[in-house]
């Protein structure tokens, strides 16, 4: 079978004729002020990108890629980074754009960037100079769009970035604990681009430059728009109800129009005329020009089962080879979501990463440190996408399931550029990876299966037989990279997908021998089948095989190296017993985790659907379908997090209380098989003191005098009330009997 993919774009990313402004040439940095525009000889910007991150001219930052990509097409692109959103003034600093505003919250969702998994305010921001918090608003996409519209009403606004991408439909919002409308509806933007934006961004920019109104640009893949009805020429499937999909369009009469009755008159035969032979076009695929009507925003907000149903449909329409468009009603309008864009080819990826990035922050930041840049300045991104399909992760929804890899030459050229141009380079490449370290050049071996598959994961519950697990391209890349002059070491900091790695032990040997700096990160996430099945993660058997091979090859190389496993607490499907078993596993293997992560319900993830609805969208949805146990509430989430840090004395009282309630008091003590030690005498006394000082809960029936009492006066009042009512009164003489 041919190895050429059947998923091909209509045209190459760089095949568009350049816009006339290409005569200005590339800018040293995309301008952030009028002074820089004057130095470049620009009277205006064609496109202005507004971002919630600091502007770092590096291919790991989305706005740098989008800006340089548009610049290569001939457009003059300006950047407004982390503007003051209190007024429209900062959004007008570069003047009025000729074509459109591009708005993004940044590399991270602004709410995740601002709040912890426990909804507590963060006091830092890695994407801001000097790690200062508070430089971007909550729901930055909405705020920035409103200010752009306030500044220039007639300029189109196009949303992008991960915040907008994961909010393209009605979605559960963890921070307000409610279902919100599509961000496209709330923001009143003109268009939304989801996922990797190069292909739709270039097409829309050129079509706007040719004078086409944005209201008429409706057929671009990877975009979402607002419509009043379905696009003409599309047929629909109604999935607004559970498991009863059906055609929306009326079924045509099988015999055509009714014929008149025969009048029995003789009819002369018609003369047959010669016709030219014509080639009939191929029959359309069943998914072409087809859309799925999802349950409306109003329906999914009021019915959790319909929400889970809509989520399940959305996740099955993500393969660019066979995905159908989606349509969801919001009030009297519809959000129309076109199918995903065709992935970039290796040649296109090479061209994107070969754009003239400076690989440093904009000079306007001076000597300020940007932690996110410090982390990646010596790293190289070798691929995009992930076919793991983890339920809690948004990478697959954002970057796609098909791996988009760069060529070996392109990666080597970037390593040499880092060596020769980046200040402070010491000869160590901090990472050679991507969303996953070991998916480089891995793809489906069957082009037809790749085009039509709707599986959520290529590796769960088992690795698909069509999936190529040959790590030879990755091994060859590692060897060539570490042989470069001036390169002392190549480290792998991206997470290794160990269930794929065990299929090719050569990769594990190469990794353990040359590319681990003492510790290697992997993410089993849990040890128990209940939560693992909801996460779509492999069991511990794959972990054990990987650890055995890793330890063997490390020993052969004469190195003492360790695995650092990552785990998630409070994930849907996790019961208290599961967390206790995980804690016992950690203690048995002598792991003491410093940083632990509670499950964070981010928009669009399957795990978030489980968290909100209590249903499992990985299986058929119905009102009587499988219910998923969800650990909610601060107390239970704190307990699950505490069990991951069983060794911390601050967590012992909470763990003891939970173990006693679960009937597992035998796990409290000093024996080796115990999880936490028994309380000391001083701890028991302190617990009694705390219980003694507690006050009963107040209700509407509590007397006002008691409500206003302090603990001291309450104690005095209680001692007074314990005496007889007439204790202090003088005794009256008894009445004479028989008077």
From Swiss-Prot:
Cofactor field: [4Fe-4S] cluster
Protein name: UPF0313 protein YgiQ
PROSITE patterns (alphabetical): RADICAL_SAM (PS51918)
Family the entry assigns: Belongs to the UPF0313 family.
Lineage: Bacteria, Pseudomonadati, Pseudomonadota, Gammaproteobacteria, Enterobacterales
GO-annotated molecular function: 4 iron, 4 sulfur cluster binding; catalytic activity; iron ion binding
Positions of region (Disordered): 685-739
Organism of provenance: Escherichia coli (strain K12)
UniProt feature, compositional bias: Polar residues: 704-724
Keyword NAD applies: no
Stored PANTHER family: UPF0313 PROTEIN YGIQ (PTHR32331:SF0)
Sequence ranges assigned to domain Radical SAM core in this UniProt record: 372-650
Residues the record lists as binding [4Fe-4S] cluster: 386, 390, 393
Feature: compositional bias, Basic residues: 729-739
Alphabetical list of NCBIfam families matching this protein: SAM_YgiQ
UniProtKB keywords: 4Fe-4S, Iron, Iron-sulfur, Metal-binding, S-adenosyl-L-methionine
Pfam families, sorted: DUF3362, Radical_SAM, Radical_SAM_N
CC cofactor note: Binds 1 [4Fe-4S] cluster. The cluster is coordinated with 3 cysteines and an exchangeable S-adenosyl-L-methionine.
């Amino acid at each position: 079978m041919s190895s050429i993919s059947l998923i091909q774009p209509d045209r190459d990313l760089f095949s568009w004729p350049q816009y006339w402004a290409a005569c200005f040439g590339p800018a040293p940095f995309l301008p952030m002020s009028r002074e820089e525009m004057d130095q470049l000889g620009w009277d205006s910007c064609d496109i202005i990108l507004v971002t919630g991150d600091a502007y770092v001219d590096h291919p790991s930052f989305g706005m740098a890629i989008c800006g340089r990509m548009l610049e290569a097409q001939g457009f003059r692109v300006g950047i407004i980074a982390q503007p003051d959103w209190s007024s429209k003034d900062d959004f007008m600093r570069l003047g009025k754009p000729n074509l459109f505003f591009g708005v993004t919250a940044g590399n991270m969702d602004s709410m995740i960037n601002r709040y912890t998994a426990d909804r507590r305010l963060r006091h830092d921001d890695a994407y801001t100079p000097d790690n200062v918090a508070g430089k971007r608003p909550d729901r930055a996409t909405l705020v920035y769009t409103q200010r752009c519209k306030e500044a220039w009403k007639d300029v189109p606004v196009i949303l992008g970035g991960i915040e907008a991408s994961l909010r393209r439909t009605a979605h559960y919002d963890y921070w307000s604990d409610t279902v919100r409308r599509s961000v496209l509806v709330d923001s009143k933007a003109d268009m939304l681009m989801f996922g990797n934006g190069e292909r739709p961004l270039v097409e829309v920019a050129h079509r706007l430059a040719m004078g086409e109104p944005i209201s008429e640009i409706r057929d671009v893949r990877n975009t979402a728009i607002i419509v009043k009805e379905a696009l003409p020429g599309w047929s629909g499937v109604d999935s607004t109800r559970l498991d009863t999909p059906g055609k929306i369009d009326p079924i045509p009469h099988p015999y055509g129009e009714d014929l008149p009755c025969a009048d029995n008159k003789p009819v002369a035969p018609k003369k047959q005329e010669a016709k030219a032979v014509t080639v009939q076009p191929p029959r359309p695929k069943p998914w072409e020009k087809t859309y799925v009507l999802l349950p409306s925003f109003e329906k999914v907000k009021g019915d959790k089962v319909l929400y889970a149903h809509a989520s399940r449909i959305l996740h099955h329409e993500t393969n660019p080879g066979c995905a159908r468009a989606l349509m969801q009603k919001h009030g009297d309008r519809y959000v129309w979501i076109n199918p995903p864009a065709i992935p970039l080819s290796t040649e296109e990826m090479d061209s994107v990463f070969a754009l003239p990035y400076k690989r440093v922050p904009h000079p306007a930041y001076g000597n300020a440190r940007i932690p996110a840049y410090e982390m990646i300045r010596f790293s190289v991104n070798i691929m995009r996408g992930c076919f793991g399909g983890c339920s809690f992760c948004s990478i697959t929804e954002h970057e796609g399931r098909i791996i988009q890899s760069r060529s070996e030459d392109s990666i080597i050229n970037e390593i040499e550029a880092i060596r020769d141009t980046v200040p402070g380079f010491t000869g160590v490449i901090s990472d050679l990876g991507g969303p996953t370290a070991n998916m480089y050049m891995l793809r489906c071996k069957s082009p037809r299966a790749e085009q039509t598959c709707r599986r959520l994961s290529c590796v769960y519950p088992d690795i698909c037989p069509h999936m190529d697990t040959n790590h030879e391209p990755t091994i060859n890349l590692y060897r060539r990279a570490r042989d470069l002059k001036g390169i002392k070491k190549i480290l792998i900091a991206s997470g290794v997908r160990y269930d794929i790695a065990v299929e090719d032990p050569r990769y594990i040997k190469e990794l353990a021998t040359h590319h681990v700096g003492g510790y290697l990160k992997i993410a089993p996430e849990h040890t128990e089948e209940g939560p693992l099945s909801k996460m779509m993660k492999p069991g511990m058997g794959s972990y054990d095989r990987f650890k055995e091979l890793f330890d063997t090859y490390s020993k052969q190389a004469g190195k003492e190296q360790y695995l650092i496993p990552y785990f998630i607490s409070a994930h849907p499907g996790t019961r208290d017993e599961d967390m206790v078993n995980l804690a016992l596993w950690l203690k048995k293997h002598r792991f003491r985790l410093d940083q632990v992560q509670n499950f964070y319900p981010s928009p669009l993830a399957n795990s978030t659907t489980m968290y909100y609805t209590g249903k499992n969208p990985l299986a058929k949805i119905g009102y009587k379908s499988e219910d998923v146990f969800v650990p909610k509430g601060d107390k239970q989430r704190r307990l699950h997090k505490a069990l991951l840090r069983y060794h911390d004395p601050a967590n012992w009282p909470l763990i003891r209380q939970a173990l006693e309630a679960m009937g597992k008091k035998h796990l409290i003590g000093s024996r080796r098989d115990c999880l936490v030690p028994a309380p000391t005498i001083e701890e028991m006394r302190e617990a009694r003191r705390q219980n003694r000082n507690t006050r009963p809960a107040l209700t509407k029936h509590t007397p006002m005098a008691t409500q206003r009492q302090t603990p001291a006066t309450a104690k005095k009042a209680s001692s007074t009330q314990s005496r007889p009512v007439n204790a202090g009164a003088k005794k009256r003489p008894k009445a004479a009997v028989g008077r």
